[in-house]
Regions:
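N-terminal/domain-start alpha-helical segments
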Residues: 1-122
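Short, well-ordered turn and helix-capping elements at secondary-structure junctions
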Residues: 31, 54, 58, 82, ...
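Pre-signature/interface helix of ABC/ABC-like ATPase nucleotide-binding domains
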Residues: 64, 82, 125, 146-148, ...
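Short coil/turn motifs that cap or connect alpha-helices
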Residues: 94, 135-137, 164
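CheY-like receiver
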Residues: 119-138
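Positively charged, aromatic-enriched patches within helix-turn-helix-type DNA-binding elements
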Residues: 140, 145-204
């Protein structure tokens, strides 16, 4: 699962990035309105954590852009503006949740999991495809009653495909979704093919 953090305060941005990376999310960051607008235009995310008070623009305008582009990312506003009016405005403009600062990182993580469950449509804690069951909260995968031992990237690839049944997935899009910014460092897609080969072997 891929998350974009839009936050201009360096220490908070770094803390959120490290915490969410430990939760096995692919995490990218932007510290300005301009940088965030470029990332949102060029890439897709599962969830965006959006500060609305940015040095070069209002985060609510980014929310507006997402809706105009018919993007389907889940949006959690994180803001020091905690009045009822601010919360209502953010939610009415399309945010999925509104978390006032300061907040506990455990609560942030719980809210991310909650909006991602809602994004899947049924709000369930597991994803079932035939005899394959994925439990995103614990990163566990079962075929029938047998639990599979998957590496992190193998799990990420499987989860990406499982959330897009009957879709043709471009290898560049898959690499960017699973490896994030680091996908640009590769000259070819051998690393993607290698992980997929291992995954197919384990699923067989």
């Amino acid at each position: 699962m891929k998350i974009l953090i839009v936050e201009d305060e360096p220490s908070l941005r770094e803390l959120m990035q490290k915490t969410l990376a430990k939760e096995r999310y692919v995490v990218e960051t932007a510290d300005t309105f301009y940088e965030a607008s470029l990332k949102i235009a060029d890439y897709s995310y599962d969830c965006i954590l959006l500060d609305i008070m940015l040095p070069d623009g209002n985060g609510l305008k980014l929310l507006e852009m997402l809706k105009e582009q018919q993007k389907r990312e889940s949006i959690i506003i994180i803001s020091a503006r905690d009045s009822i009016e601010d919360k209502v405005l953010g939610l009415e403009q399309g945010a999925d949740d509104y978390l006032p600062k300061p907040f506990h990182l455990a609560e942030l993580n719980a809210r991310i999991k909650s909006v991602l469950r809602r994004q899947r449509g049924d709000g369930s804690r597991s994803l079932q495809l035939g005899n394959l069951r994925i439990e995103p909260d614990s990163f566990r995968v079962f075929v029938g009653d047998k639990e599979l031992e998957l590496l992190k990237k193998e799990y990420d690839i499987l989860f990406y495909f499982a959330n897009r049944p009957n879709h043709i997935i471009d290898k560049a899009v898959l690499a960017e979704a699973v490896w994030g910014d680091h996908a640009d460092d590769a000259d070819n897609f051998h690393f993607v093919y290698a992980q997929m080969k291992n995954l197919r072997r384990k699923l067989a």
